[in-house]
């Protein structure tokens, strides 16, 4: 599997994500600097990592979404290439228009860094096929702006089209309807605030994030 991990000024989870992809998928991903304007045509995955791109100035992900590399990401996503945005990556994908809604300041106005309970809502996305519907998992979060917000019509549409990927099992940050991750209409773009790459082996406290990458491998096989 050929994967690319984007790197922006302020990214700090890009190496963790690259290690997870290499460990599970067996190939070392390309590390793509944000100033690149092209991506290889034969990619099987584009991963947008967590961190604080551009220091979260203006809004989280707002400046990164306007980086030189993003038109190529949008083009590949429209072709059906799987795109995974984690934490700041999720924020970037919403700012770029690849996913609906926005990530606002946490309801408690504080940075949240802990493991949280999640419930799998969708099992048809290439990232989620090895999970079971309504399966309970735990993944770590580490964010200040993870409060998912959208208007009621958009939220209803996400529910009706089975595009809510994961839901918190409790109110973590004030997210509308406890949404932790959403999909685009095709199902090939996933954005989520929790960090699956930080929980892929028992030494990390569990392997609940492993199947998010293994699912994609199964689809590509």
From Swiss-Prot:
Its main location: cytoplasm. One of its GO terms (biological process) is 'de novo' IMP biosynthetic process. SUPFAM superfamilies: Class I glutamine amidotransferase-like. SMART domains: GATase_5. Pfam families: GATase_5. It comes from the Bacteria. InterPro entries: Class_I_gatase-like, PRibForGlyAmidine_synth_PurQ. It catalyses: N(2)-formyl-N(1)-(5-phospho-beta-D-ribosyl)glycinamide + L-glutamine + ATP + H2O = 2-formamido-N(1)-(5-O-phospho-beta-D-ribosyl)acetamidine + L-glutamate + ADP + phosphate + H(+); L-glutamine + H2O = L-glutamate + NH4(+). It is found in: Cytoplasm. GO terms for molecular function: ATP binding; glutaminase activity; phosphoribosylformylglycinamidine synthase activity. Residues 3-221 form the Glutamine amidotransferase type-1 domain. Its EC number is 6.3.5.3, 3.5.1.2. Pathway: Purine metabolism; IMP biosynthesis via de novo pathway; 5-amino-1-(5-phospho-D-ribosyl)imidazole from N(2)-formyl-N(1)-(5-phospho-D-ribosyl)glycinamide: step 1/2. GO terms for cellular component: cytoplasm. The keyword Nucleotide-binding applies. NCBIfam families: FGAM_synth_I, PRK03619.1. Part of the phosphoribosylformylglycinamidine synthase complex involved in the purines biosynthetic pathway. Catalyzes the ATP-dependent conversion of formylglycinamide ribonucleotide (FGAR) and glutamine to yield formylglycinamidine ribonucleotide (FGAM) and glutamate. The FGAM synthase complex is composed of three subunits. PurQ produces an ammonia molecule by converting glutamine to glutamate. PurL transfers the ammonia molecule to FGAR to form FGAM in an ATP-dependent manner. Part of the FGAM synthase complex composed of 1 PurL, 1 PurQ and 2 PurS subunits. This is Phosphoribosylformylglycinamidine synthase subunit PurQ. The gene is purQ.
């Amino acid at each position: 599997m050929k994967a690319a991990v984007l790197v922006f000024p302020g990214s700090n989870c890009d190496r963790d994500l690259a290690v997870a992809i290499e460990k599970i998928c067996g190939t070392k991903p390309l590390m793509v600097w944000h100033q690149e304007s092209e991506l290889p045509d034969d990619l099987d995955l584009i991963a947008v990592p967590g961190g604080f791109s551009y220091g979260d100035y203006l809004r989280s992900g707002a400046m990164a979404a306007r980086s030189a590399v993003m038109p190529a990401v949008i083009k590949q996503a429209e072709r059906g290439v799987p795109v995974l945005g984690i934490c700041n990556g999720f924020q970037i994908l919403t700012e770029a228009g690849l996913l609906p809604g926005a990530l606002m300041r946490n309801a408690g106005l504080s940075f949240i860094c802990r493991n949280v309970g999640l419930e799998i809502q969708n099992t048809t996305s290439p990232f989620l096929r090895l999970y079971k519907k309504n399966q309970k998992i735990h993944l770590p979060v580490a964010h200040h702006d993870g409060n998912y917000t959208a208007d009621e019509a958009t939220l209803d549409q996400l529910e009706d089209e089975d595009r809510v990927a994961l839901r918190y099992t409790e109110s973590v940050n004030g997210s509308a309807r406890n949404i932790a991750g959403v999909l685009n209409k095709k199902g090939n773009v996933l954005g989520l605030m929790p960090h699956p790459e930080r929980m892929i082996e028992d030494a990390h406290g569990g392997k609940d994030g492993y199947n998010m990458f293994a699912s994609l491998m199964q689809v590509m096989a």
